[in-house]
Amino acid sequence: MNIIVVGLSHKTASVDIREKVAFSPNSIEKPLHELVNLDGIVEGIIVSTCNRVEIYATTRDIAGGIARIRRFMAEYHHLAHDLLEPHLYSYHGEEAIRHVFRVASSLDSMVVGEPQILGQIKTSYGYAAEYKSSGIILNRFLHKAFSVAKRVRTETRIASSAVSVSFAAVELARKIFGNLTDKTVLLIGAGEMCELAARHFLTNGAKGVMVTNRTFERAQRLAEEFGGEAIPFDELFLHLHKADIVLTSTGAPHAIITPPDLEEVIKRRRMRPMFLIDIAVPRDIDPAVNEMDAVYLYDMDDLQQVVAANLEGRKQEADKAEAIIAEEIIQFYKWVATLEVTPTIVALRNRFEELRKAELERTLAGWKDAPPDAEKRLEALTSAFMNKLLHQPTTVLKKAGQGNRTDLYLDALRALFDLELGGTDTNESLELEE
């Protein structure tokens, strides 16, 4: 079984392409089911964030699996293949593993070291687990990716000098206005991105924060936390003129602010500049508003320019992180190698366990004067003997799984003990590996 990755990111596609292939978390069950029903695809996970849309899958047919997923990404969103193809990348084997470890560790993020991506991948994995599109390989793979990310964050300083995308938005605002001391900020959305932005804006001297959200209670909670004002979502345009800086990050499928919406707002502001930062994908603000006087709109692609200067300072820590990832790839491959031999090991242990129990029962049945603790003692004795007897062949088989003589050992063992390979329980397989 092979791990493959197909996707696009801020490195290969602009925001107008990324928003066309974004998967909504509110309807993720359908594409997950369609994904694992593709010919040759066994397991699948969809990761869809502002900056990337990626599919992690397992397949026995690498080339065919990659081709089918590339077609799926276009056809599911009713896009022409030619539109999407130039922006897609694909990996398999070691490169796929390395890519996902790097993504989870925030080495492939627009802002290296930002913490949001790990949480986003965990959420995506949660959907796959809930809708049963992931299995033994991707489950183990994603958990390994999470532990690699934790190790990178613990053993390097890659996060200490990192800034989030939200902070990059603040930096962009400072470049426009000079300082934020007399500026009022409006957050449209009450998620993690907006919460981080509120902290950064206030830390950098913003006068006040207003928050609006479709769920008013969430807006109230966030506004209360920062001493700001909560605004009902349907009253957005009654208050928009008060904001010097507007940051949007909602899950809306279409633009919620268009040029006609801003015409009266700009008049009420008496043409004072208005700075709009759209970090949502799909975008919350119609790009056409950038043509209006006194309106300055920036989206996720623009943020990349703000954070570029910070990347060089983190290069040394990133190099340490790459070394950690290289180590962890080796460890993960050792586990993958055991997958081929695990069914044979399980079958061998089951065969010996059957023999052990049969002989134990026969012995106890013929032992008329057996002491009360005889069964307990014999159970412990025979179990310990069996485990010691099987330790060496089990070890040899696991090592064989990492070499080029695997088939030789497996065929010999199956023939010698007439082993039948049934369905191997997932948990039992994992316990054997441990």
Swiss-Prot record:
One Gene Ontology term of the molecular function aspect: glutamyl-tRNA reductase activity
Enzyme Commission code: 1.2.1.70
Enzyme class of the recorded protein, top EC level: oxidoreductase
Active site, UniProt feature: C50
Note in the entry: During catalysis, the active site Cys acts as a nucleophile attacking the alpha-carbonyl group of tRNA-bound glutamate with the formation of a thioester intermediate between enzyme and glutamate, and the concomitant release of tRNA(Glu). The thioester intermediate is finally reduced by direct hydride transfer from NADPH, to form the product GSA.
NCBIfam families, per database record: hemA, PRK00045.1-3
Family statement drawn from the similarity comment of this UniProt entry: Belongs to the glutamyl-tRNA reductase family.
Protein name: Glutamyl-tRNA reductase
Source species: Trichlorobacter lovleyi (strain ATCC BAA-1151 / DSM 17278 / SZ) (Geobacter lovleyi)
Taxonomic placement: Bacteria, Pseudomonadati, Thermodesulfobacteriota, Desulfuromonadia, Geobacterales
